[in-house]
Amino acid sequence: VSALAGVTLPNVHAAGSDLIRVALVGCGGRGTGAAGQALSTKSGPIKLVAMADVFPSKLKASLERLTKQYPQQVSQIDVPAERQFIGFDGYKAAMDCLKPGDVVILATPPAFRWVMFQHAIAKGLHVFMEKPVSVDGPRRAG
């Protein structure tokens, strides 16, 4: 470990631009917190550009909370109504706002994440999600 202490690693940014676009899928408390942490990073220019949730009230509350809790990052939040997606397929529309190399935050119940994860990887996106990535269905004993 000490041999690597003096090595400087380059910052990694999305191809073609220094701007890293972020989409949030799952706008509850954990997703909102993860988006806020992403916006607070000093690693590079980051912008929240799309949000998706099954419940309109969750998405609205998340957007309001982000703008109030992170006033220094308000310029990094660019999620107009046309990039706010409601419903079970909203994750696809939110990810479609991104380019390969951008980031999607998956903060949904684990039962749905594997489908979203597959879509994100197929689009060339980086993914942030917490464990468990997915859950196994119940099995019969014996």
Predicted regions and their residues:
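N-terminal glycine-/serine-/threonine-rich beta1-alpha1-beta2 phosphate-ribose binding loop
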Residues: 1-125, 142
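A contiguous active-site-proximal alpha/beta segment in oxidoreductase catalytic domains
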Residues: 126, 133-142
